[in-house]
């Protein structure tokens, strides 16, 4: 049991390290300007206007789908239920689950703030 636990901890540390590396790669590449622009938006209508200019319909649907997958995973839905409800692939569901378990708590923070 201790060997399995140690391997699980090591895998988690590797995943956390990868997640933090991804975050570090984002910094300093114009991302802060994007985040500042998003934070400047004051209404849902402004969000629609900005994201309509910034993203394709498919990109927006993908982002919304990932957030819904995160919400459903937090509520205890199964992969099959999530796939049937959202159309997300098991790869997408797995990636979101990995972020929920080992990421930077971004999904949790956002979903808690919007009451989901």
Q: What is the predicted function of each stretch?
A:
Residues 1-41:
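General nucleic-acid-binding
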Residues 45-65:
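Short, Lys/Arg-enriched anionic-surface-contact patches
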Residues 63-77:
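Short, amphipathic alpha-helical "recognition" segments used to contact nucleic acids or chromatin
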Residues 81-86:
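Short alpha-helical "recognition helix" segments of helix-turn-helix
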Residues 97-100:
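DNA major-groove recognition helix of helix-turn-helix
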Residues 104-116:
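Short Lys/Arg-enriched helix C-cap and helix-to-coil transition segments
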């Amino acid at each position: 049991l201790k060997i399995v636990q140690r391997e699980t901890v090591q895998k988690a540390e590797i995943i956390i390290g990868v997640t933090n590396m991804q975050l570090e790669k984002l910094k300093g590449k114009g991302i802060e300007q994007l985040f500042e622009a998003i934070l400047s938006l004051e209404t849902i209508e402004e969000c629609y206007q900005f994201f309509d200019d910034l993203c394709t319909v498919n990109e927006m649907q993908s982002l919304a789908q990932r957030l819904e997958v995160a919400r459903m995973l937090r509520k205890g839905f199964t992969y099959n239920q999530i796939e049937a409800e959202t159309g997300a692939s098991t790869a997408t569901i797995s990636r979101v689950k990995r972020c929920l378990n080992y990421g930077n708590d971004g999904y949790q923070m956002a979903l808690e703030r919007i009451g989901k």
